[in-house]
A protein has these predicted regions:
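Glycine-rich cofactor/substrate-binding loops
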Residues: 1-34, 62, 85-89, 282-284, ...
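Generic, well-ordered alpha-helical scaffold segments in large soluble proteins
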Residues: 42-47, 99, 103, 138, ...
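A structural signal for small-residue-enriched, beta-sheet-centric alpha/beta enzyme cores
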Residues: 123, 218-221, 236, 240-248, ...
């Protein structure tokens, strides 16, 4: 059976293929081979630039242009050729080396030094840098832009709903009012902080040989400062240098990165669930789309499917991220191979996250606040004013203010008249009474509006 969206085992490449297409060139087998080719080529070019490595003279402009073109024009056909070679070698990185030897065979200058392709490298020197490039591109071109879209969408909601009061709920029960805008601002600021954490994780790389000590490098060129060359090469790729490793770069930074992404996702799950609840309460309506069906048997249904889809896919993403973060920093002695198969799933976690981000954004775009529903709820809960009344009573030295309001309101239905009568009987200045009587559940929102202004 041929692979297609209908026959793919993973929904990332099946049902949701259109939502994850931007990740294919980064996390696919083609993507990994593309980065490996880039690392191998740049390493060869760096060797040629080192005057102490006389056996690899400085390359001519023509030869450097050929090498640059191999990187820039790397194609699916090139990747397929590498896979053909791998069928013989049964070694994926060695297949890249042999592919490059084929590519430079027609250039006498490069073919003369083709044994310096993959010089002194262990496979993990190439792989860790390839994964670093992969994660850098994914973070910079996919993850962070989606983070920004989500944060911007929530800030826009916060501004739009800035003046719309709502009854808050703690423990699921009525609590002091807020505004819908302020509640959106809370989420935006939480996401903003985690976005900054994601952005500042240093993506590390190493190129120091089979056990991290430059053994092979020094055996051939003892007078080369390989520490300096290693740092210069890794940073030239846009990565941060890790000078202390075993055979593998220990992947601690991958755990840091995915832990930060998982926290971002967890906040988004919290948001998805809250909006789901507000829709259930009638506080949000959803714009309907012609032709869409909400239920196979109940024609009236308009379900919060986007937020449900997001929640489910974020859970899958975090399950993968959590495993990667827990597993990858652990490798027996100087290395075992358990990280290899796990690292092939970097894109799976990111894929589920990206699918979820798109679902949340779609859900947000369909939201319409039901202001009347929010106002009705506030008007049905005048007991919310127990808090400001007992607080002002404390100011004026009235005995047992909390207890008196508890007696008036706890477990009871209170209306405007009952609240006004209670205030009239208080021993406090008339101006203070007037201020309290002017309060309504809808106006008792504290500094919620100004807090949105400060976003």
């Amino acid at each position: 059976m041929e692979l297609s969206q209908l026959t793919a085992i993973s929904p990332v490449d099946g049902r949701y293929a259109g939502k994850s297409v931007e990740l294919r060139s980064i996390f696919s087998e083609y993507g990994l081979l593309k980065y490996r080719v880039e690392v191998e080529v740049r390493w060869l070019q760096m060797l040629s630039a080192n005057t102490k490595i006389e056996e690899v003279p400085a390359f001519s402009d023509t030869s450097n242009a050929l090498l640059d073109a191999i990187v820039a024009n790397f194609s699916v056909d090139d990747a397929m050729r590498i896979k053909d070679i791998e069928r013989t070698t049964n070694h994926d990185v060695k297949a890249v080396e042999y592919f490059l030897k084929e590519q430079v065979a027609s250039n006498s200058e490069l073919s003369a030094v083709n044994e310096f392709i993959h010089f002194a490298c262990t496979s993990e020197d190439i792989n860790n840098l390839s994964h670093g490039l992969m994660l850098t591109e994914a973070r910079d071109t996919v993850l962070l832009p989606y983070c920004d879209k989500l944060i911007d969408a929530l800030i826009a909601l916060a501004k739009e709903y800035q003046h719309i009061p709502m009854m808050a709920r703690t423990h699921g029960q009525p609590a002091s009012p807020s505004t819908m805008g302020k509640e959106m601002a809370n989420v935006a600021m939480r996401l903003k902080r985690q976005r900054a954490q994601i952005a500042k994780v240093e993506i590390l790389g190493k190129i120091n040989g089979a056990v991290g000590n430059y053994n092979a490098h020094l055996s051939a060129y003892a007078d080369v400062d390989w520490h300096s060359e290693s740092e210069k090469f890794v940073t030239s790729l846009g990565l941060s240098w890790n000078p202390y490793t075993t055979q593998i770069e220990p992947h601690d930074y991958i755990a840091e990165l995915f832990d930060a992404v998982a926290r971002f996702n967890t906040i988004l799950i919290d948001f998805d669930r809250d909006v789901w609840g507000y829709i259930a309460l009638g506080h949000f309506k959803q714009k309907t789309i012609a032709g869409e069906i909400g239920s196979s048997t109940m024609p009236h249904k308009v379900n919060p499917i986007d937020f449900e889809n997001s929640e489910g896919n974020l859970g899958l993403a975090n399950a993968i991220f959590n495993h990667l973060a827990a597993k990858l920093p652990i490798s027996r002695w100087q290395r075992d191979l358990t990280d290899s198969t796990v690292l092939r799933n970097l894109g799976v976690g990111v894929g589920y996250a990206v699918i979820a981000y798109q679902a949340t954004l779609k859900g947000i775009s369909k939201l319409e606040v039901n202001e009347q529903s929010l106002l009705n709820e506030l008007d049905n809960n005048w007991e919310l004013l127990a808090e400001p009344i007992q607080t002002v009573m404390r100011r004026y030295g009235i005995e047992k203010p909390y207890e008196k309001l508890k007696e008036l309101t706890r477990g009871k239905k209170v209306n405007a008249e009952i609240v006004a009568e209670f205030i009239d009987n208080l021993d406090m200045p008339e101006a203070a009474k007037a201020d309290l009587k002017a309060l309504t559940p809808a106006s008792y929102i504290g500094d919620a509006i100004r807090l949105v202004d400060q976003l």
